[in-house]
Each structure stands twice: as C-alpha cells, then as structure tokens.
Amino acid sequence: MAQDLSEKDLLKMEVEQLKKEVKNTRIPISKAGKEIKEYVEAQAGNDPFLKGIPEDKNPFKEKGGCLIS
C-alpha cells in the first residue's frame, strides 16, 4: 500500500501520526520504570508463572498414564 502512495501522501501520513503522538503525556523513564516495577510487584501474587498452578486446576496435567506392555 505504501508503495502506491506519493512521497507527499507519505509525508502527510507521517505528520498526522506525529500530531497524534505529540498529544501523549510523557513522563521520565525513571518514573515510568518505578511505576512498572511497583505494578509488577503488586500483581506477583496473581501470576501463575511465579506462584504455580494447583495440581487439581492444571489444564495441562496428563489425565492418565501410558502403559506399554
């Protein structure tokens, strides 16, 4: 699709995208990193990768064994 557009059209699209992006609220990475860390630590108790899945609720647990005779 981009190949079908002229350079002028591509530049217009880029300007429109930049106009949208300039409206975004920006925060320093130090603050964003701290907020992400706090969120992850707060949600750690609900994370099955950290907490594990109870055996009775594990959908991937094998239902039966394999018997080769």
From Swiss-Prot:
Q: Which residues form the propeptide?
A: 67-69
Q: Does the keyword Chloroplast apply?
A: no
List the InterPro entries hit by this protein, alphabetically: G-protein_gamma-like_dom (IPR015898), GGL_sf (IPR036284), Gprotein-gamma (IPR001770)
- The superkingdom of the source organism is Eukaryota
Which terms in the Gene Ontology molecular function aspect does this entry carry? G-protein beta-subunit binding; GTPase activity
**SUPFAM superfamilies hit by this protein:** Transducin (heterotrimeric G protein), gamma chain (SSF48670)
Q: Which PROSITE patterns match?
A: G_PROTEIN_GAMMA (PS50058)
Indicate where this protein resides in the cell.
Cell membrane
What are the alphabetically sorted keywords of the record? Cell membrane, Lipoprotein, Membrane, Methylation, Prenylation, Transducer
Supply the Pfam families for this chain: G-gamma (PF00631)
Q: Name one GO cellular component term.
A: heterotrimeric G-protein complex
Q: In which tissues is it expressed?
A: Retinal cones.
Q: List this protein's GO terms for biological process.
A: G protein-coupled receptor signaling pathway; phototransduction
Q: Lipid moiety-binding region for S-farnesyl cysteine?
A: C66
Which parts of the sequence carry Cysteine methyl ester? C66
Which residues belong to the signal peptide in this entry? none
The UniProt entry's sequence similarity note says:
Belongs to the G protein gamma family.
Protein function: Guanine nucleotide-binding proteins (G proteins) are involved as a modulator or transducer in various transmembrane signaling systems. The beta and gamma chains are required for the GTPase activity, for replacement of GDP by GTP, and for G protein-effector interaction.
Assembly and interaction partners: G proteins are composed of 3 units, alpha, beta and gamma.
> What protein am I looking at?
Guanine nucleotide-binding protein G(I)/G(S)/G(O) subunit gamma-T2
Q: Which gene encodes it?
A: GNGT2
